[in-house]
């Protein structure tokens, strides 16, 4: 495929995770201690089920910060953002809570931008997945060349005009894509949003509940995705190889991983708002984060839709929270094969 503006064929080079690491320069994340900025985003108005705002506290109480520090991460906790419900937040057509969701994301954008300007990997603890509008927008203000890996049972790419539920946690990607700019009406609360991604900048993994309108958008825009059918057919190793080759095979750039825990099978993460059977296994979920970590290019991470109130038993809550913590730790270097410090006796 010709490189844009070059007028000639450019050979496609597929780098392995090891080669990505070897090519990192002295300023890369892989050549110095991992610096993490944690932002708690206790927000639920992008969907109808209460309890997802408890996610950040549950993850911290599970020892996330201490475990990151034990992994030799330099951690700064920015605390929980304080979100305010906008009064008289009437629906826009059927879109619910537009002003409240828009304001929350604008607030998150500013904080993520600050974290990135401070040179830290942003770690947003959700909260519902509508917050990725702010998380990715803030990241893109500092790293406009970023790419996104979106792990989810859902594509979250409904527009305000195609949505059948009106829930904004099913629409964030449509606000972020430049190709859909003309499909987004002027919604109260979102005048600040500037699309920051092109269709070629995102890859989905784990899809298995996609609305017809969303499927049309994915196909029309040529967006790369691996539904669970492709995961089953190819295996997660091939999926990750193709994902990384597609996004960073030609040029290294920052990776933003937006991870909805409902991407995993409900047997693994039952305490979430929109579980869908037939999802990623625990092992597949960790393989994704391990491979992204190995690139040394992870620059932003969202852990979304942990809802402790939806676990039917304490075990279901603990299983979901512990899995979310494990995914996060894996992003920052905890490997199933084991780890050791570079410090020698």
Where are these regions (language model features)?
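Short active-site oxyanion
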Residues: 120-122, 199-203
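Short, well-ordered beta-to-alpha junction loops that form the rim of enzyme active sites
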Residues: 42, 126-129, 153, 207, ...
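Aromatic-lined glycan-binding groove of carbohydrate-active enzymes
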Residues: 199-201, 208-214, 250-255
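Active-site-proximal loop/helix segment associated with metal-binding centers of metalloenzymes
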Residues: 187-192, 208-226
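Residue-identity detector for glycine
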Residues: 5-7
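Catalytic cores of soluble, metal-dependent hydrolases
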Residues: 12, 17-20, 24-44, 48-123, ...
């Amino acid at each position: 495929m010709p490189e844009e503006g070059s007028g000639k064929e450019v050979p496609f080079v597929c780098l392995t995770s090891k080669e990505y690491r070897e090519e990192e320069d002295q300023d890369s994340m892989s050549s110095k201690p991992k610096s993490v900025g944690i932002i708690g985003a206790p927000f639920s108005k992008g969907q109808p089920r209460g309890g997802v705002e408890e996610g950040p506290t549950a993850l911290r109480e599970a020892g996330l910060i201490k475990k990151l520090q034990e992994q030799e991460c330099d951690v700064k906790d920015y605390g929980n953002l304080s979100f305010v419900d906008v009064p008289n937040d009437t629906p826009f057509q059927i879109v619910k809570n537009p002003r409240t969701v828009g304001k929350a994301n604008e607030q998150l954008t500013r904080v993520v931008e600050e974290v990135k300007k401070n040179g830290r990997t942003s770690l947003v603890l959700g909260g519902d997945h509508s917050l990725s509008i702010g998380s990715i927008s803030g990241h893109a203000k500092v790293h406009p060349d970023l790419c996104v890996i979106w792990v989810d049972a859902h594509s979250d790419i409904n527009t305000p005009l195609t949505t059948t539920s009106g829930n904004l946690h099913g629409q964030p990607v449509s606000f972020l894509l430049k190709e859909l700019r003309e499909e987004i009406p002027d919604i109260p609360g979102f005048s600040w949003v500037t699309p920051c991604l092109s269709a070629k900048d995102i890859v989905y993994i784990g899809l298995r509940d996609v609305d017809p309108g969303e499927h049309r958008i994915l196909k029309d825009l040529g967006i790369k995705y691996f539904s669970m059918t492709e995961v089953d057919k190819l295996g997660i190793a091939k999926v990750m190889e193709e994902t990384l080759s597609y996004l960073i095979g030609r040029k290294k750039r920052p990776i933003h991983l937006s991870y909805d825990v409902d991407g995993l099978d409900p047997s693994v993460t039952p305490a979430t708002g929109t579980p869908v059977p037939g999802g990623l296994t625990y092992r597949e979920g960790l393989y994704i984060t391990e491979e992204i970590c190995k690139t040394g290019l992870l620059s932003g991470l969202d852990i979304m839709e942990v809802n402790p109130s939806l676990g039917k038993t304490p075990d279901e809550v603990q299983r979901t929270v512990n899995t979310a913590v494990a995914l996060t730790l894996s992003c920052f270097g905890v490997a199933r094969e084991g780890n050791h410090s570079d410090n020698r006796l």
